[in-house]
Structures are given as C-alpha cells and as structure tokens.
Swiss-Prot record:
This is Alpha-1-acid glycoprotein 2. InterPro entries: A1A_glycop, Calycin, Lipocln_cytosolic_FA-bd_dom. Keywords: Acute phase, Disulfide bond, Glycoprotein, Pyrrolidone carboxylic acid, Secreted, Signal, Transport. Induction: Synthesis is controlled by glucocorticoids, interleukin-1 and interleukin-6, It increases 5- to 50-fold upon inflammation. Coiled coil: none annotated. Contains a beta-barrel that binds various ligands in its interior. Expressed by the liver and secreted in plasma. GO terms for biological process: acute-phase response; regulation of immune system process. Its main location: secreted. Pfam families: Lipocalin. Functions as a transport protein in the blood stream. Binds various ligands in the interior of its beta-barrel domain. Appears to function in modulating the activity of the immune system during the acute-phase reaction.
Amino acid sequence: MALHMILVMVSLLPLLEAQNPEHVNITIGDPITNETLSWLSDKWFFIGAAVLNPDYRQEIQKTQMVFFNLTPNLINDTMELREYHTIDDHCVYNSTHLGIQRENGTLSKYVGGVKIFADLIVLKMHGAFMLAFDLKDEKKRGLSLNAKRPDITPELREVFQKAVTHVGMDESEIIFVDWKKDRCSQQEKQQLELEKETKKDPEEGQA
C-alpha cells in the first residue's frame, strides 16, 4: 500500500534540481548510511501518492489514513515496519520487515513472494522522504510522500507536486490522505503500553 516498492531508474535527480534548486534539494541513489537509518528510525505519516498501477491506486483510494514506525537493525541491514491503516473507519495493523541495500540506496520488501525494490529519496530539510517505483512503466509508475508530521507545509506539498510531474505524471493523479480520519492512534497507544509491561515483567522476575 503506502510502501509497495519496485525498481526505478535514476533520472529523477537532474530533472528535479533543474526545476528550482532553491526549493528542491533532492538526491536519488545515494548510499544509505547509519546516519540515514538513525534519521529514519521514527514515526512517519503517509501523506499521499501518485500511482498509475490500477491495483495500488485502488488500495490507496480505500485508505483514509496511514502512519507507520520504522526501526532499523544496523547489524543485519533490515528495518522493522509497523503500519497502522485506517480503512472504512477501522484500524488495520500490519508488521513486516524491509531489506536495506546500502550501496544502491534502496529498500526492498517481499510482496506475494516476490522481492521488490524502491529508491529512497531523502528530504531531510522537510522532515520527509519519498519512494519512487516503476518509473520506467508508463502504466504503473508511482511516487509516494511520507513525513514526520501529518500536516505538511505548502512548500513540501509543492516539492512533491513538482516531483510527480517530472516523472511523467499529472498532479491530478495525486491522492492525499486525511490525517484527521485517523482511527489507529488509540490502538498504537495500547500496543506500546502492552510492550512496556511485557518488557517490565522479566526484569521484575529477576529482581
């Protein structure tokens, strides 16, 4: 859904930088460092996506809101992904792991038994990142935006809109979610409290 990822070409950077270097400072294909992973280790909000793949587009249209937590493992180059989707006013939770390809600057995920990839595009000054996928395919390409805050600035929205047009899509293809329709915050809170209690119990038993 928010993080469906497929291998992409690397022509995005020059197109974006040529548009307006003052407001768009984007790199693609940069190696993923420990610093990048530490920065990614946080709670993120799926803001929206422009997706031409009809199956993915249909899934996003049904989604009212998504937030997720990323927890990298620096030893085995994986990242735990915990997603909270609000669909039809109900919360749907999912947990999985992403692979990290440091040198290529990509993340990977198994979907339907197939390993797929996406380039990570870091927008650190905006507290956001994009995932670009399948840009070579005119019928399936897509670009998603994720941020540390659900209420993004007009500047970040403009950066995303320009990126979408530069990869060959129209702004009208963008589907933004509505963070005010969140139905998962309470469930996340309960899960975190339960995990704290679970961690506490073994320690008390050893005391």
